[in-house]
Amino acid sequence: GCCHIIACRMGCSPCCW
């Protein structure tokens, strides 16, 4: 659950990469 742009930029979510 953290696919938001902020989470992406914080390196939180693999689904964003």
UniProtKB/Swiss-Prot annotation:
GO cellular component: extracellular region
Subcellular localization(s) per the UniProt record: Secreted
One MF term in the entry's GO annotations: toxin activity
Annotated domain remarks: The cysteine framework is III (CC-C-C-CC).
Residue numbers bearing the Methionine sulfoxide modification: M10
Name of the protein this chain belongs to: Conotoxin SI.14
Key word Transmembrane helix present: no
Family note: Belongs to the conotoxin M superfamily.
Source species of the chain: Conus textile (Cloth-of-gold cone)
Disulfide bonds, paired cysteine numbers: C2-C16, C3-C12, C8-C15
Tissue: Expressed by the venom duct.
Keywords: Disulfide bond, Oxidation, Secreted, Toxin
